[in-house]
């Protein structure tokens, strides 16, 4: 589960596309990848329908959730309340619903998909 600040921003598309492009690697590990922002479903759809060459996402292999109430962001502790957006949070939750890893980055700092895969593999290896 990863949170990102807003659709149509600078860092977000590179992260989301990277997670989408490697979704099969996560699936092979028994993982589902979900992206979350405070944007509405219509905004997600517009971003997905915008070609990558024009700053859009294009077709994705992962779902984007619309946290318009900001309850998910608040519950996971990533809501930047003064701006009403989420920090870049990554939560790795195992098949039993146990939270295994939390990483929260400041707004301008992106995440590496390789590191997320490594963390999933590490938690599975130690089980």
Swiss-Prot record:
Its EC number is 1.11.1.24. GO terms for molecular function: thioredoxin peroxidase activity. Residues 1-125 form the Thioredoxin domain. Keywords: Antioxidant, Cytoplasm, Disulfide bond, Oxidoreductase, Peroxidase, Phosphoprotein, Redox-active center. The enzyme can be inactivated by further oxidation of the cysteine sulfenic acid (C(P)-SOH) to sulphinic acid (C(P)-SO2H) instead of its condensation to a disulfide bond. It can be reactivated by forming a transient disulfide bond with sulfiredoxin SRXN1, which reduces the cysteine sulfinic acid in an ATP- and Mg-dependent manner. It comes from the Eukaryota. The active site is at 12 (cysteine sulfenic acid (-soh) intermediate). The keyword Cell membrane does not apply. It is an enzyme of class 1 (oxidoreductase). Pfam families: AhpC-TSA. CDD domains: PRX_Typ2cys. Transmembrane segments: none annotated. GO terms for cellular component: cytosol. The keyword Repressor does not apply. GO terms for biological process: cell redox homeostasis; hydrogen peroxide catabolic process; leukocyte activation; removal of superoxide radicals; response to oxidative stress. The active site is a conserved redox-active cysteine residue, the peroxidatic cysteine (C(P)), which makes the nucleophilic attack on the peroxide substrate. The peroxide oxidizes the C(P)-SH to cysteine sulfenic acid (C(P)-SOH), which then reacts with another cysteine residue, the resolving cysteine (C(R)), to form a disulfide bridge. The disulfide is subsequently reduced by an appropriate electron donor to complete the catalytic cycle. In this typical 2-Cys peroxiredoxin, C(R) is provided by the other dimeric subunit to form an intersubunit disulfide. PANTHER family: PEROXIREDOXIN-2 (PTHR10681:SF161), THIOREDOXIN PEROXIDASE (PTHR10681). Thiol-specific peroxidase that catalyzes the reduction of hydrogen peroxide and organic hydroperoxides to water and alcohols, respectively. Plays a role in cell protection against oxidative stress by detoxifying peroxides and as sensor of hydrogen peroxide-mediated signaling events. Might participate in the signaling cascades of growth factors and tumor necrosis factor-alpha by regulating the intracellular concentrations of H(2)O(2). Homodimer; disulfide-linked, upon oxidation. 5 homodimers assemble to form a ring-like decamer. Interacts with TIPIN. This is Peroxiredoxin-2. The gene is PRDX2.
């Amino acid at each position: 589960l990863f949170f990102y600040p807003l659709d149509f921003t600078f860092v977000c598309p590179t992260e989301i596309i990277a997670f989408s492009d490697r979704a099969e690697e996560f699936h092979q590990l028994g993982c589902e990848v979900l992206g979350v922002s405070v944007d509405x479903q219509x905004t997600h759809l517009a971003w997905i329908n915008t070609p990558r060459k024009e700053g859009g996402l294009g077709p994705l292999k992962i779902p984007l959730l619309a946290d318009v109430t900001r309850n998910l962001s608040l519950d996971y502790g990533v809501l930047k309340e003064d701006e009403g957006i989420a920090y870049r949070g990554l939560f790795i939750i195992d098949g039993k619903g146990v939270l295994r890893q939390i990483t929260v980055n400041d707004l301008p700092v992106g995440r590496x998909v390789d590191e997320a895969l490594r963390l999933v593999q590490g938690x599975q290896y130690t089980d």
